[in-house]
Amino acid sequence: MGNTFGHLFRITTFGESHGGGVGVVIDGCPPRLEISESDIQYDLDRRRPGQSKITTPRHESDTCEIISGVFEGKTLGTPIAILVRNKDQRSQDYDEMSVKLRPSHADATYEAKYGIRNWQGGGRSSARETIGRVAAGAIAKKILKQVANVEIIGYVKRIKDLEGMVDPSTVTLENVESNIVRCPDPEMAEKMIDLIDQTRRNKDSIGGVVECVARNIPKGLGQPVFDKLEADLAKGVMSLPASKGFEIGSGFAGTLLTGSEHNDEFYLDETGEIRTTTNRSGGIQGGISNGENIIIRVAFKPTATIGKEQKTVTNTGEETTLAAKGRHDPCVLPRAVPMVEAMVALVLCDHLLRQEGQCGLF
């Protein structure tokens, strides 16, 4: 239960961190879309471990295999299965964690819910589960780009108390990928890298905020009342490992304004389209896209598994301590960027198909 996401563009992820592999089954992808492993691999490479000194040193190529649903380079309209095999597991690093519960990790809650857990690498609660999401998100991005020229760009906005200055209306993928922390503010990026590296040497971890902008969004996406577009975006990104907060548009800062200060006033552009002079709504009003840029922010906590000794208990109820072994990210933010993009793409693609199905016939 709980492994499937979406309505018309529907994904089910599978696999564990130290199992044979991880992947996704996509149902509802339109037929005749040109797709190949290379379309998917680019985003998987951005997500994969071992890519820099500020990420986990686990070495995985994360090479994807399309198992079904594609023939002669085009989608068939049938379920698409994508598999990535695990190759660099070091399960012995987790022997101690078979008994000791990691503070603030899913160990204790999985044990409480199921009465059993895969302690090798965190099993299903590992961030390797997101490989399937990123693979499916790459296909969703291609649909959105081809149908509506939608562009989705995520980037690191903040690491701990270091915040970059980024204009979401002009930021490019090249700006984001110009450094290993994926912050488009070059000066702040260097400070972030130094802070993460120092935290790693201290056997600790830090968190931060990923901001994501979706541009060229068609008007009308979103389903009132329980499937509002921002509600589904929040559900999507808040289902990512280590996510702890969600904002759209002005977010919590909007509570400091009056209505006259916060309202996005309307005007007619040169083509007669209704536009807004500001975008404090973040591109969504009444749960439905208004055609402006959708801008969201996702807060990620510090990585739970750290090398510093902490107090904990065993699964048999004895107090003890744990200094975790294994290979872990000192900060999840650089690798979380393509994960956030993927969830945004999945939500927007699903709602695009729903909009066409309900309102696009007449």
Swiss-Prot record:
Cofactor info, note text: Reduced FMN (FMNH(2)).
Gene Ontology terms describing biological process: amino acid biosynthetic process; aromatic amino acid family biosynthetic process; chorismate biosynthetic process
PROSITE patterns assigned: CHORISMATE_SYNTHASE_1 (PS00787), CHORISMATE_SYNTHASE_2 (PS00788), CHORISMATE_SYNTHASE_3 (PS00789)
An annotated GO cellular component: cytosol
Catalysed reaction, written as an equation: 5-O-(1-carboxyvinyl)-3-phosphoshikimate = chorismate + phosphate
Cofactor: FMNH2
Family annotation (PANTHER family): CHORISMATE SYNTHASE
Subunit structure: Homotetramer.
SUPFAM superfamilies, per database record: Chorismate synthase, AroC
Known pathway: Metabolic intermediate biosynthesis; chorismate biosynthesis; chorismate from D-erythrose 4-phosphate and phosphoenolpyruvate: step 7/7
Stated name of the protein: Chorismate synthase
List of residues binding NADP(+): R47
Binding site for FMN: R124, S125, S126, G286, K301, P302, T303, A304, T305, R327
Superkingdom of origin: Bacteria
Protein species of origin: Rippkaea orientalis (strain PCC 8801 / RF-1) (Cyanothece sp. (strain PCC 8801))
Keyword set includes Amino-acid biosynthesis: yes
Gene3D superfamilies xref list: Chorismate synthase AroC
UniProt keyword annotations, A-Z: Amino-acid biosynthesis, Aromatic amino acid biosynthesis, FAD, Flavoprotein, FMN, Lyase, NADP
EC number: 4.2.3.5
Family classification: Belongs to the chorismate synthase family.
GO-annotated molecular function: chorismate synthase activity; FMN binding
Alphabetical list of InterPro entries matching this protein: Chorismate_synth, Chorismate_synth_AroC_sf, Chorismate_synthase_CS
